[in-house]
Amino acid sequence: MVMKCLRALFATTTLLTGIGAGNATVRIVDDPGGWIGTYVDRYEGVRVSGERVIIDGSCVSACTIVLGTVPHDRICVTSRARLGFHAAWDPDARGRKITNPQATQTLYSMYPFEVRRWIDQRGGLTPRIIYLSGRELASMFRPCYLDSQALSR
């Protein structure tokens, strides 16, 4: 009886945590972004691990680095996905945002062609955030549906 319970517990844990590199899933829900280096490191780890990415809400600013780091075929979007893009910036001595052209170009060059074209059609990366969602986003990335693996993250 104890052995049967342990097997059931292990099976449930395996299903919920997505054990196995090819089965694990990272779910992005409401990510406002942050420092570029932090996100490059995070998503490089996801790329190397073989994990899949579900974008199921806001992914803004540095969060969008996922698009240029994780292979396209391992990213999917739900109907709630919303990507926000803007120029990269650094704070000045007073804490004001100063656009960083080099970092902006680096970010831009990481994005897939379809995303770069969409950004270009809206005037490029500027201090103003532009959002990609709905049909336009769905035309660029495959749709995904939540399952128990995604809900556990």
Annotate the PLM regions.
Residues L16-I19, R153:
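Intrinsically disordered, low-complexity linkers and terminal tails enriched in Pro/Gly
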Residues R27, G37, D41-I54, A93-R153:
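Charged, glycine-interspersed solvent-exposed loop segments at helix/strand-loop junctions
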